[in-house]
Amino acid sequence: MTRIAFLRHGPTDWNAQGRIQGHTDIGLSQAGIARMAALRLPPLCDGARVFVSPLARARHTARLLGLEDGNTDARLMEQNWGAWEGLTRDEILAQ
């Protein structure tokens, strides 16, 4: 049986600030690095093929979890939010 698991990248400073990231290549925050480094995946993930977004936050998360990030796929990137990237919801509504 084929199993598919999805894991979101670790936290970034923009996540903490409520900012839209989209395609902007924001790295993990220090708290995000610590959080991902402390996680352990279940044994059923051993030897799994891993596919990640080409964005640094996704690739770094994979490496911190002991996963190879060699299979990058742009289709896994977050939506491109254009001019809204980097803004908070309140900033967008104020425009």
Features from the language model and the residues they span:
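Phosphate-handling substructures
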Residues: L65-Q95
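Active-site-proximal alpha-helix that buttresses catalytic centers in soluble enzyme cores
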Residues: T2, L7-E68
